[in-house]
Amino acid sequence: MRTEYCGQLNLSHVGQEVTLCGWVNRRRDLGGLIFIDMRDREGIVQVFFDPDQKAAFDKAYDLRNEFCIQIVGTVRARPDSQINKDMATGEVEVFAHALEIINRSEPLPLDSNQVNSEEARLKYRYLDLRRPEMADRLKTRAKITSFVRRFMDSHGFLDIETPMLTKATPEGARDYLVPSRVHKGKFYALPQSPQLFKQLLMMSGFDRYYQIVKCFRDEDLRADRQPEFTQIDVETSFMTAEQVREVMEKLARELWLDVKNVDLGDFPIMTFEEAMRRYGSDKPDLRNPLELVDVADLVKDVEFKVFSGPANDAKGRVAAICVPGGAQLTRKLIDEYGAFVNIYGAKGLAWLKVNDRAAGMEGVQSPIAKFLSAEVLEAILARTNAQSGDILFFGADSFKIVTDAMGALRLKLGRDLELTKLDSWAPLWVVDFPMFEEDGEGGLAAMHHPFTAPRDMSPEELAGTPTNAIANAYDMVINGYEVGGGSVRIHRSEMQQTVFSILGINEHEQREKFGFLLDALKYGTPPHAGLAFGLDRLVMLLTGTDNIRDVIAFPKTTAAACLMTEAPSFANPASLQELAICVVKKASEQESE
């Protein structure tokens, strides 16, 4: 039905007759002619109708926004005075000879001239996706997946599918369960990741695997989370962590070059401990120059208990952030930052303005200055590299509260004061994560997942001092987003059983939930390692949006609902009976009946 896309016409098409299909983006009458902007997935081109072509001109009178049409016309170069440099097709226009109105459109429930609510956009998603910026994002997504497949294929990886209906295993979030009609009372689980299957493929000898795969997690949503999401899943045998990172870094660098024409350069490597101490985050945004600086050793003996208390506590922390030019901040704004860190458990935010670096005590302004000796003040200013016109913010509390609060403050200051270089790219690898973290109930939980191998420890050493264990894990971070994470996997049954035991999974439960894995580990399992990229987050970064719903064709809301199809919905009672499922109503629902 078409010979060209609207958005691809240029001066090379001048004089050619073309057939275009698409939608009326805008219509206007000017000087006896009818002009429309015609749109398809590739962009917009100007089309005009002349009374000399009476049949087409008469039909064009009926055109309204979003009518679906086909036109036949000749491409012409626009006069120099009419060239539109804001349009990709702005040097040309199409003189229409014939017009067919394929389908008319009622007035749209979305207004193209104003910002529509996200609720309206999701309810009428098929209309929202007609917008050029939305189409561009999905086209970029398609370009990314196509590039990834070519790269992986060229590096010897095999695209192998893994099951969608599988067994529930503890991976950190709730599973979506699917009842079995044949095996009444039993349930499949939709996979949170293909983790165990890809490890089993390594045990099967496939060596290099990848898959662009849907994953499912029933968890509370955030702006960058969805109940169903897409991973670029990768696993390798006989490769070290360093070799895996090398290949995956090459993929990221070539992807950025292909999509953005940006060379990311070599990725620096930073340990988890360094990232938390310097940036207050295990996914630091290195575009922001601000850092957390530890000063606990300098304030152990000051009379200010807010500082000296945590400074003398093995689990405490006192850290400062030096903000260049921050001495100009008003007291009102400083108080707002104090309220901000309260969100993260901090009891307050101490501050010190450096008005004149050379003037010592006389050159600073702060409610806490009276508690600091000249020597302590000088030591703090020297360590933080404070200069005249700067401000220091201090956090003092438990290590976790200070790290979380000051890390969040660092990001906010970077945005508010325009210190973060938003037009740049800052990738890195974060490595050497703790193997375990406290679960809040007196036990331990795996920081990544329970199949990650420890670095340089035997099962006996791991069982003896699990809190000292460092995981052989790595995350790829770009501009403060964790875009991919992976690890070397456990490939010996004894080590896997030890990890399960540390996590409180007894022998019976190990056999019940992971018997197939423990059995497979007995039969010559090769060393293996892998990584998974979050495709949705990659597309977010590469398209410049901060909302994951902008890069998914039909996303869910933060309440895990689809406003367009009204999913989830109630099941037919007959279907529930066939599945042997009984829906238990809440007491409040029973009372209302």
From Swiss-Prot:
- UniProt keyword Cytoplasm, yes or no: yes
Q: Where is this region: Aspartate?
A: 195-198
Query: Which keywords describe this protein according to UniProt?
Result: Aminoacyl-tRNA synthetase, ATP-binding, Cytoplasm, Ligase, Nucleotide-binding, Protein biosynthesis
Q: Which residues bind L-aspartate?
A: 171, 217, 448, 489
GO biological process assignments: aspartyl-tRNA aminoacylation
Gene Ontology CC terms, in alphabetical order: cytoplasm
- Quote one Gene Ontology molecular function term: nucleic acid binding
Q: What is its EC number?
A: 6.1.1.12
The reaction(s) this protein catalyses: tRNA(Asp) + L-aspartate + ATP = L-aspartyl-tRNA(Asp) + AMP + diphosphate
Q: Which domain of life is it from?
A: Bacteria
Intracellular or extracellular location(s): Cytoplasm
Residues binding ATP: 217-219, 226, 482, 534-537
Subunit notes for this chain? Homodimer.
User: Which family does the record claim for this protein?
Assistant: Belongs to the class-II aminoacyl-tRNA synthetase family. Type 1 subfamily.
Q: What job does the chain carry out?
A: Catalyzes the attachment of L-aspartate to tRNA(Asp) in a two-step reaction: L-aspartate is first activated by ATP to form Asp-AMP and then transferred to the acceptor end of tRNA(Asp).
What is the protein's name according to its record? Aspartate--tRNA ligase
**Organism ancestry:** Bacteria, Pseudomonadati, Pseudomonadota, Gammaproteobacteria, Enterobacterales
